Each structure stands twice: as structure tokens, then as C-alpha cells.
Amino acid sequence: MVVCIGTQWSHFKPVHTLNSIQVLCKANCCCYACKPPPFCCFWLCFCCCFCLALCFVHLLSRCFCVFPVCLSVAAYAVVLGVHSEPVCSFWSVFVLFFNPVAFDTPACPQCGLQQNDVNTAHRHVIISYFAIVAVNIYFVLALLVGAAFKATSRART
């Protein structure tokens, strides 16, 4: 445990063993934050994969369903806009869900962050994560059904 001096960021206590999401203190106030490299790399990879998927679908069928695309983008925007702590990566939130130690973090003495607030923040991120996964599964299934339907219609003609 490191004492917070001035406005310098310092580690207060790791939330879980992988250290991807940590409790930090800044000027006697605690918050949740993640390391910038995993966060930036994750969103960069996501944007690239998402654009490649859209290009692939466009080349495959020359048309795609806009509704699941809008749902997927909206789900990610909600996570970025609503939660104060960024989602570092899929695996970090995945570990938070399956690691009960992550829900046993004590209250922070610097700002008095309560245990219930910590647990609620974690559960909100987890719920949003699984909502995003569900939307993306729906998106992939919609594309597969559309491609199969187009293939059968071409076979008939």
C-alpha cells in the first residue's frame, strides 16, 4: 500500500491478481481506472475487426442488416458513456466475474468509498459486458442467417 502524495497517481490496492483494474488514489480520492495500453489496444483491435467485418459482409452480400450494427455500436457507447471506470479488456471483466476476491475489496480510507459502491460498479460493468456479448452474438447470427438465405435463393435461381 502506497500513501497518496499530492496529485500523483499511486497504487492503493490491487482489485485482483491480474492487476488490470486497480483501486487508485489521487489527491485523497479513490476511483477505478485501468492501464492505458490494454484499453487503447482493445478498442483499436475492436474498431479494426468491426470495420473488417462490415467490409466482409458488404462484399459477401452487398447488403447487411443495419439494426444489429446499430445495437452493437450503441452497446459499446453506453459502456463508455455511463461507467466512470473504463473497461480495460474483455478478459479483465471476465476475470472480475469469475474471481470472487474482486468483490471483497475493502472501503478506501482516503475517500470513504463503501463496499457496496465497489460491488455495484463491478456488477454494472459485468452486466454491460454480457449485454454487449449478447448483442454481438445476435449480430453474427443475423449475418449468418442472411448469408444462408441469400445462398439458398441463388441456388434456386
UniProtKB/Swiss-Prot annotation:
Keywords: Early protein. This is Probable protein E5.
